[in-house]
Amino acid sequence: MEHVDTIVIGAGIAGLTAARLLVGAGRGVVVLEARDRVGGRVHTDRSEGRVTDLGASWIHGVEDSRVADAAIAFGMPVVEFTVGGYQPDGRPIAYFGADGRRLDADATARFVADVRTLDAALGPVIAGSAPDATYRDVTETALAAQGWPADRSARVREHLEHRSEEQYGVRIEDLAAHGLDDDVIAGDEVVFPDGYDRLASSLAEGLDVRLGHVVSRVMWAPEGATVPGFSADQVVVTVPVGVLQSDDFVIEPPLPDRQRDALARLRMNAFEKVVLRFPHRFWDADVHAVRQLGPHGAWWHSWYDLTRLDGVPTLLTFAAGPVARAVRGWTPERVAESVTAQLRRLYGAQVPDPTDVIVTAWQDDPFARGSYAYMMPGSTTRDHDDLAEPVGGVLHLAGEATWTDDPATVTAALHSGHRAACAVLGWTVPIASAWS
């Protein structure tokens, strides 16, 4: 059995950050990764000479962002694309009404103003909500207080429903009232024309990463931890919530009640990307996104123009929440037909068949079991930190679901890896030493 100071399970951003900081502090570390690549849910497809991020895409706000700092240090080019947080405005967005016609500037401004008004009203309603309240509950309370006509309320309600689905891949009634508390964008959002996976590969440089090494059992005790083939003084586990909750990954002895209860109040979402490349552009020029209002947008309601990144006319949409589950198992061609039918409702017969279709399948990935975690009703933001509380001075959990301030992001993964490394060491190391 090979012995090291620390075993890190998972070569995603959390695991790689923790490992890099520990190695920098002089510790012996092995990173065990089940996949044949590093990055975890940061995964870039480079087939046919194109760059497509299948997992994480955005830095959601570059102001005071450690991920942005790392990207700069690693020489990763970025492109500003500030619509990833489902903002109602700020960048050009073509809104289409329930009748399939584009809203004019005045109608768009009125709709956006209503969304902003409700968002402002939501804050105090959420703050005073019951522990088991859902985002649906607080939305309805805030809407009722506005006294708007039914159709006006319906459009804003619909926007919040779609935002919940696009931000967390879950229906609004299944998300805790506090589930979007950290959905705040500070500064521009950016994407990576050369792929987000450059962050993972850069963090992995110089580390002892064992690919194709599936860990299904972690044994820990006061004197250390073992996994098949390895022993260590401490272990950092960075597998996603969906894996932690599965029978295929066992921690013995089990997690203490505090961590186990926090874990039980989180769930992995259903959230898939659909990338469509077309022979020519047919949608509105000079817009970042196209959005469909009204009941026809129940499935496909938002498309993001990736042409600047791709070099060919390209739209990105999402199968989120119930839609992702409904199309699970569909062929990419069938998904494309469904999406294209909706686009033709907006743009008519000029919409051609796509020349290329990519549909992700994170729900079916045994090492992810979804895209990222969300807070169920009854959960609190404290659950993220409770999950990360060190166990016995030996076992440490890290990953996007263990960071309170900005969960479900690469930022959360990076910071959680830093926190785990500091807990292992027993002192604080600068996070920037992971890339400087």
Which residues does each PLM region occupy?
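FAD-dinucleotide binding site
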Residues: 1-436
